[in-house]
Amino acid sequence: MKFIDEAKIYVKAGDGGRGCVSFRREKYVPFGGPNGGDGGKGGDVVIVATSSHNTLLDLKYKQHHVAKHGGHGEGSNRTGRSAPDLTIPVPVGTLVMDSESGEILADLVTEGQEYIVAHGGIGGRGNARFATATNQAPRYAQSGIPGEERWIRLELKLLADVGIIGLPNVGKSTFISRVSAARPKIADYPFTTLTPHLGVVRYGDDLNTFVLADIPGLIEGAHEGVGMGIQFLRHIERTALLLHIIDISRDETSTGWHDFEVINSELASYSPELILKPQIVAVNKTDLPITREKLKDTLRIFAEKGIVLYPFSAATGEGIPALLYKIGEALKNIRYRQTEHE
């Protein structure tokens, strides 16, 4: 299934019910006063975050969402029934924006968090409300107030601790499938990962966990929409840490440094804040002879730039425990610093 992480929808809250024109009519009261009730309130349109949804696919194909109108007022001063709210479930991590202005209306990051995107109209007043000393039998009532309407844009950003980045086919999907229960489609060609994947990783004594997000491989020009484009970069904006995987086995001359620079250039072009995120850099496919032959030079080149490389093999599992431990410790330090600043 294609992953849908954006949707534009029209929402219309319910109109308020019409006020009632009515007069008291009883056997011995031929000229009773006005007793028309007020109209009921129209239903609100409410966006609700829920973990039971993980895509915006449904909203991509159902764009119009209209709440019910309030009931009309009735005689005997009976108020019309208020309409129920229309709730629209979205995945946790959804950003709600006004489609026209781009204004961020809500950032729904917790289960059950909700935001009213369109308020229902108030019911019109019945004729009983308009009776005065000089007009004891008003023959008019108010119409209900129309409900709010607007176009909104929804944008989903996956919530994960660690975002895995790298060029296509460096082994990100193989890595996440080995270390977590996630099972992304894996094949030996670029752009196998067509959708982001989340995986929960347990390490050490299995009491420590973190969440990985595997996104499609980036290529030069990704921030301008080349390849899979920038639509997936937003999913790593909320991560605390980036795991940058490189592959030096694809040709005889590659040391991984050029690839490393390409990816970081794309991150910087997309968001200056993204490039400032801490990165752990790891070189995959140490099970291949060509990688083992070139590994020493690659380690030296990165070390000269002040970067420690973590070699591993997603195919055999070699080096993965040490890499997971390093990621876990880095996350603990980041969270500790965040707690200190709160």
Swiss-Prot record:
- Where does the source fall among the domains of life? Bacteria
A GO term (biological process) for this protein?
ribosome biogenesis
Q: Which residues bind GTP?
A: 166-173, 191-195, 214-217, 284-287, 313-315
Cofactors named for this entry: Mg(2+)
Residues involved in Mg(2+) binding: 173, 193
Keyword Protein biosynthesis belongs to the record: no
Molecular-function GO term, any one: GTP binding
- Could you tell me which InterPro entries the record lists for this protein? G_OBG (IPR031167), GTP-bd (IPR006073), GTP-bd_Obg/CgtA (IPR014100), GTP1-OBG_CS (IPR006074), GTP1_OBG_dom (IPR006169), GTP1_OBG_dom_sf (IPR036726), OBG_GTPase (IPR045086), P-loop_NTPase (IPR027417)
Record's function text: An essential GTPase which binds GTP, GDP and possibly (p)ppGpp with moderate affinity, with high nucleotide exchange rates and a fairly low GTP hydrolysis rate. Plays a role in control of the cell cycle, stress response, ribosome biogenesis and in those bacteria that undergo differentiation, in morphogenesis control.
Whom does it interact with, and what assembly results? Monomer.
Protein name (record):
GTPase Obg
**Protein's organism:** Syntrophus aciditrophicus (strain SB)
